[in-house]
């Protein structure tokens, strides 16, 4: 009997712009342009980001103001809508609840598994809290334990364990360095091509 399917998608770079790159462009702090496409160690990346925010006196509302100006990538909402009409879709992201709400609203409120920030009364981000380490791979494994076939797509280093755990994983909008390092995953740049690849697995 054919198993039911869940699709898991990364958020930033796949459906919406990279939040930290947008914030870096707004503030002029070039070091904030580093993302999980550049740094495979997420703790190193986040500790560096928090140190930069402190050094420049920037707080959560400053980031939220920039997020409020962002929109999903062109074609993302239609792609997600068509995919959700075919199968269950869950967004697995290393973003934070405090960042995601405006973008989730624009995408039609898909289910999102992500992390949490510690923020003091003045709005300073004091720390970040992972819901669990390697949560993307862990979520896929949990869905598989419920007898789901899992299809996945992402663009960054932090997606590759999710893609490897999934029954089928694809790269989407991934930079050339990641495509070269992980040639086992088929890579796409257009939503219609990714949708066709998913449909072929359903």
Q: Which residue ranges define each predicted feature?
A:
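Short, well-ordered alpha-helical microsegments
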Residues: 97-101, 159-160, 195
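Short acidic-hydrophobic, aromatic-tinged amphipathic segments that line or gate anion-handling sites
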Residues: 113, 185-194
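Alpha-helical substrate-recognition element adjacent to the catalytic core
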Residues: 2-116, 120-121
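Short amphipathic alpha-helix with an adjacent loop that forms part of the alpha/beta core around
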Residues: 195-202
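Acidic, Mg2+-coordinating phosphoryl-transfer loop and its flanking beta/alpha structural elements
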Residues: 89-94, 148-189
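Substrate-recognition "cap/lid" segment bordering the active-site pocket of phosphatases
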Residues: 98-150, 181
């Amino acid at each position: 009997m054919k198993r039911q399917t869940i699709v898991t998608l990364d958020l930033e770079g796949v459906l919406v712009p990279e939040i930290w790159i947008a914030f870096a462009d707004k503030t002029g702090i070039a070091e904030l342009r580093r993302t999980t496409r550049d740094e495979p160690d997420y703790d190193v990346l986040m500790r560096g980001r928090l140190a930069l925010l402190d050094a420049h006196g920037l707080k959560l509302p400053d980031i939220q103001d920039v997020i409020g100006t962002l929109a999903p990538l062109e074609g993302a909402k239609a792609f997600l809508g068509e995919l959700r009409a075919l199968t269950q879709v869950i967004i697995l992201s290393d973003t934070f609840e405090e960042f995601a709400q405006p973008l989730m609203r624009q995408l039609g409120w898909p289910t999102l598994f992500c992390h949490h920030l510690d923020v003091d009364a003045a709005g300073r981000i004091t720390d970040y809290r992972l819901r669990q380490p390697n949560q993307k791979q862990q979520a896929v494994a949990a869905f598989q334990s419920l007898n789901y076939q899992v299809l996945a797509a992402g663009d960054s280093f932090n997606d590759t364990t999710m893609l490897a755990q999934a029954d089928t994983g694809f790269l989407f909008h991934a930079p050339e360095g990641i495509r070269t390092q992980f040639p086992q995953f088929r890579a796409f740049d257009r939503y219609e091509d990714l949708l066709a690849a998913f449909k072929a697995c359903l």
